[in-house]
Amino acid sequence: MVGIPGVGKSTLLTTMVEILKNHKKNVIVINYGSLMFDVATKNGLKDRDDLRKLSVSEQQRLQKLAAETIATHNEEIVIIDTHAFINSPEGYYPGLPEHVLKIIKPSNFVSVSAKPEEIYNRRMKDDTRNRDKITLANI
């Protein structure tokens, strides 16, 4: 499941998982950025939101390691929560580039969208993350 930051992916996933579990499905949600951060902390990264500030080559390396971990999961339903694009110092980079898709081999792809005003308001209220400031016009 992909979407831009603040679109509501994680909130939607909470409801989806509850419904799936009520239907006796074995489901796991993996936040791709959190998995990448787990690996990056071993190399000294302190803030999850600094992942996007790494070079694209380092992001690619972390994405590959995270994808290899995801590919080992054997739950009936594995849902990946990630961003469609990451705003990096080298420009926008896909959250699920081709080299990752070849490893995880997804069977479905869901893109979440919302009105820019809703996204902006969610981002402004979220004090749990160290997000880059953005204007409504840029969303």
What label would you give each PLM region?
Residues 10:
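Walker A/P-loop
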Residues 124-139:
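Small-molecule kinase domains that catalyze NTP-dependent phosphoryl transfer to phosphate-bearing small molecules
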Residues 4:
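P-loop (Walker A) phosphate-binding loop of NTP-binding proteins
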Residues 28, 32-94:
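ATP-dependent small-molecule kinase phosphotransfer cores
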